[in-house]
Amino acid sequence: MAADRAQNLQDTFLNHVRKTKTPLTIFLVNGVKLQGIVTWFDNFCLLLRRDGHSQLVYKHAISTIMPGAPIQLFEGGEDQPA
């Protein structure tokens, strides 16, 4: 059940930043920093676009994703129902 919730949060987050075209900074596990906008994603990878170029990034290589602006995924602020 926890795995389902984590997947749903991941999909909710990625879908939100894709729809709103929120700029992201993505850190890979090897320390590389990528920046851009998510244009597409699936269970294994995401497509990051910047300056007219696209990069296919495998999710297993991602350490951290930081939005360039505050986002609100759920109504009612930061508190989430269990």
UniProtKB/Swiss-Prot annotation:
Chloroplast found in the keyword field: no
Subunit structure as annotated in this protein's UniProt entry: Homohexamer.
- Mention one GO biological process in which this protein takes part, according to its record: regulation of DNA-templated transcription
Q: Give GO MF terms, alphabetically.
A: RNA binding
Q: What is this protein called?
A: RNA-binding protein Hfq
Keywords on record:
RNA-binding, Stress response
Describe the function of this protein: RNA chaperone that binds small regulatory RNA (sRNAs) and mRNAs to facilitate mRNA translational regulation in response to envelope stress, environmental stress and changes in metabolite concentrations. Also binds with high specificity to tRNAs.
Pfam families per the record? Answer: Hfq
- Provide GO CC annotations from the record: cytosol
Instruction: Pinpoint the Sm domain residues.
Output: 11-71
What domain of life is recorded for the organism? Answer: Bacteria
Sequence similarity: Belongs to the Hfq family.
Q: To which species is this protein native?
A: Bradyrhizobium diazoefficiens (strain JCM 10833 / BCRC 13528 / IAM 13628 / NBRC 14792 / USDA 110)
